[in-house]
């Protein structure tokens, strides 16, 4: 298609050597050749040995023409290190060209932040060209400038001196200024031993700043490079002159903190040991020794403690120890405040105290322990109602007031009540483990019984005392299986608290009716008028049994 020489299109081979003598130009210095070299260096073309050889030759020529000495001890050390690093860089160029290119790219990016005339007029014999060559692998003057910039960026005088870079092997390779690596940060320099750091910090600040100015050779240096070493050196000199004082202060503070922690731990351990000793003594000895052991644990201002002869070993109390700690003082006072009780009513145990034997913090709960120890029962006790409960309550209140040391302050009374309730909780748990049989007898004219027994025979004998007061008509109807479903026997007139274990026996709409046998649950009579003394809680399964049929399991 391009056979005719008169064609208006150009021939594709017009740049041949014979046709175009302009191709004999210097390919190395032409802008197009420089652009081609730059583009090939971006891609890290490792298959181009001519480009790598040209870069190595250029770097070695710059090393030979650069002067060997300069004024200033810090400056000569920095220059010698950068020269050695550049030699290492040129040696690395032969082995790994990719790393040399990547390091040269980072060098160029840092070099862009410098002023072009800043490349040392005082420290170099020949003027450095101001042309920006970003992909030059080893430029000594730019390396020194980059090293100074690294020190200024890290805001520490340690990083601008070459002697401290020798201490760290990693910053030896990076000391040529190829990259502002994180290994040259002030934190990595401070990881050395204190003696070595103190000896290295003795370099004067003026010498360091002078060395930096000699290498840079320009007044356009950022002010942080000359002012920051002075600031940091003043701090370091203060730390250097008094390392023993700082270490002694830190050691004293640590010792004080550790001693405080040890004292707190010792106090807690002693209290726990006394608590466990009291429990063991109570479980192994009689009532007198148990009372003495409990008195050794409780201060005398807490009043006379309850007898702990019913306590078991510490294995019984260990699962509930956290609960005891949590409900020691304030929860009981909050509970009494919620119930509307005052300190006087708490100490006198007025009848408005809740009578749940599982109540967490009820003064009337350990009535069985009071009777076992020969102490009078508090007023409001369901067993003592109608049997001299008033006199017992007055004697109990007077005894508790006398046991508190005659103190009339409300704080002492509240502390005594809280201590007694805490002890009552321990006794209730121990009694629950030793006497599992509870009488849950409730009558329309009687309160909740709540007595505990160790065997089922004792409970059965106690139930006979309740049934003796029931009318004969009711007993005969019960024997015939015709007890009316709205009888108080099938009702819960006592509202137990939600946290009580007794609440598990209350009616639940999705529970199984295991409380009554089928013969005692006849069809209900909705038209039957309720008894005047009937409570507000009905037995729902006996009322709605015929409607459920076989739908309920």
Swiss-Prot record:
Low complexity biased stretches? 96-110, 121-134
Q: Which domain of life is it from?
A: Eukaryota
Q: Which GO terms describe its molecular function?
A: zinc ion binding
Share what the entry says about its subunit structure, partners included. Self-associates. Interacts with gro and noc.
- What does this protein do, in the record's words? May negatively regulate Notch-induced cell proliferation in the eye-head primordium. May act in leg and wing primordia to negatively regulate body-wall specifying genes and thereby promote appendage formation. Required for tracheal development.
User: Which residue stretches belong to region Interaction with noc?
Assistant: 287-553
> For bias kind Gly residues, which ranges apply?
388-406
Q: What is this protein called?
A: Zinc finger protein Elbow
Hey, which family's this protein in?
Answer: Belongs to the Elbow/Noc family.
Question: Might you report a single GO cellular component term?
Answer: nucleus
Q: Where are the zinc fingers (C2H2-type)?
A: 437-466
What organism does the UniProt record list as the source? Drosophila melanogaster
Biased amino acid composition, Polar residues = 137-146, 153-173, 224-236
Annotated spans, Self-association: 287-480
Q: Which UniProt keywords apply?
A: Developmental protein, Metal-binding, Notch signaling pathway, Zinc, Zinc-finger
User: What Gene3D superfamilies has UniProt attached to this entry?
Assistant: Classic Zinc Finger (3.30.160.60)
- The UniProt gene name for this protein comes to elB
Spell out the residue ranges making up region: Disordered: 59-243, 388-407
Q: Matching InterPro entries, A to Z? A: Elbow/Noc_ZnFinger, Znf_C2H2_type
For this chain's UniProt record, which GO biological process terms are given?
Answer: compound eye photoreceptor fate commitment; eye-antennal disc development; imaginal disc-derived appendage development; negative regulation of DNA-templated transcription; negative regulation of gene expression; Notch signaling pathway; open tracheal system development; wing disc development
């Amino acid at each position: 298609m391009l056979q005719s020489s008169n064609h208006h299109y150009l021939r594709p081979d017009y740049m041949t050597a014979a046709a175009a003598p302009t191709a004999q130009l210097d390919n190395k210095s032409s802008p197009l050749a420089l652009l081609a070299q730059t583009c090939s260096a971006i891609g890290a073309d490792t298959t181009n040995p001519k480009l790598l050889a040209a870069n190595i030759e250029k770097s070695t020529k710059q090393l030979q023409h650069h002067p060997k000495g300069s004024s200033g001890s810090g400056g000569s050390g920095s220059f010698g290190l950068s020269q050695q690093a550049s030699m290492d860089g040129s040696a690395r160029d032969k082995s790994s060209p990719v790393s040399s290119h990547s390091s040269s790219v980072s060098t160029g990016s840092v070099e862009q932040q410098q002023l072009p005339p800043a490349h040392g007029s005082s420290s170099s014999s020949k003027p450095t060209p101001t042309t920006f060559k970003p992909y030059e692998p080893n430029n000594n003057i730019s390396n020194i400038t980059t090293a100074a910039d690294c020190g200024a960026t890290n805001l520490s005088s340690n990083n601008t001196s070459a002697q401290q870079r020798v201490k760290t092997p990693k910053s030896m390779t990076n000391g040529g200024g190829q990259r502002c690596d994180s290994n040259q940060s002030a934190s990595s320099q401070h990881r050395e031993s204190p003696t070595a750091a103190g000896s290295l910090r003795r370099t004067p600040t003026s010498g360091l700043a002078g060395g930096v100015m000699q290498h840079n050779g320009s007044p356009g240096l950022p002010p942080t490079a000359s002012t920051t070493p002075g600031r940091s050196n003043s701090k370091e000199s203060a730390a250097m002159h008094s390392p023993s004082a700082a270490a002694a202060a830190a050691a004293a503070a640590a010792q004080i903190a550790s001693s405080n922690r040890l004292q707190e731990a010792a106090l807690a351990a002693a209290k726990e040991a006394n608590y466990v000793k009291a429990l063991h003594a109570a479980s192994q000895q009689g009532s007198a020794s148990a009372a003495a052991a409990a008195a050794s644990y409780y201060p005398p201002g807490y009043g006379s403690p309850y007898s702990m002869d019913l306590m078991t070993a510490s294995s019984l109390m260990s699962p509930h120890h956290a609960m005891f700690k949590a409900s020691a003082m304030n929860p009981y006072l909050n509970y009494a405040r919620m119930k509307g009780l005052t300190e006087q009513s708490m100490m006198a145990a007025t009848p408005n105290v809740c009578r749940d034997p599982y109540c967490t913090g009820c003064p009337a709960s350990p009535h069985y322990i009071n009777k076992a120890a020969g102490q009078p029962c508090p007023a409001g006790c369901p067993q003592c109602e109608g049997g001299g409960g008033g006199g017992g309550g007055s004697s109990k209140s007077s005894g508790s007031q006398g046991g508190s040391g005659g103190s009339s302050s409300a704080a002492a009374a509240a502390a005594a009540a809280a201590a007694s309730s805490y002890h009552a909780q321990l006794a209730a748990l121990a009694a629950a483990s030793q006497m599992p049989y509870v009488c849950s007898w409730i009558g329309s004219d009687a309160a909740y019984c709540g007595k505990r027994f160790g065997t089922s025979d004792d409970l059965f004998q106690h139930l006979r005392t309740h049934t003796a007061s029931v009318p004969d008509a009711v007993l005969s109807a019960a024997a015939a299986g015709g007890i009316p479903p709205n009888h108080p026997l099938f009702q819960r007139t006592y509202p137990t608290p939600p946290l009580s274990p007794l609440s598990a026996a209350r009616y639940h709409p999705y529970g199984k009716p295991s409380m009554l046998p089928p013969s005692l649950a006849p069809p209900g009579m909705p038209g039957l008028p309720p008894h005047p003394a009937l409570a507000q809680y009905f037995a729902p399964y006996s009322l709605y049994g015929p409607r459920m049929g076989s739908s309920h399991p």
